[in-house]
């Protein structure tokens, strides 16, 4: 069980919620949420794919299978190569074999069901929506491979979806860089209302949001981030998850 949330986290989440409740602006407030490593922990997705791979190779390569079976959730890193190193898989041919198998499945509807919401995430997004905000999910997932699974997972976990005031923005092309997509997508939310808060795990996206919407409360989820990520802007807040108690 994780430790109780820090007072700073509780106060920040309540402050955003209170801003929505007391909103007096001409346009409706918009709160933006990323999905992977923000609302959802997608490391279980990687573990499931690895375990599936193990079942296919355990007879032919028991040594590789045993190494992969030693993987635990806390060993799953942002980069698969780092994850494989954590369980002792270094050989280039093995790394390539596992990586190809993983890549064919990770960005696919069928495996999104493995994702797990971070603590308090469904409840908090529901509260934001119930308080009167439009909610925008802006994700680096792509339309062709992940739209159906994403909608189903949001629904199954109790996030608001498929109702008025909910936006879901995905990349039109899986090969498009996430930051480039968000650089183009975030400004379009001006059509929906005024962006007052944004939650994302990537420092680059948080800094981008702060430059696009200076008055906005921008919050980084301290989960996983791309290696070599830029330093967070001074006025970006940091939390661990969405628990308020």
Predicted features along the sequence, with ranges:
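Acidic, Mg2+-coordinating phosphoryl-transfer loop and its flanking beta/alpha structural elements
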Residues: 192-240
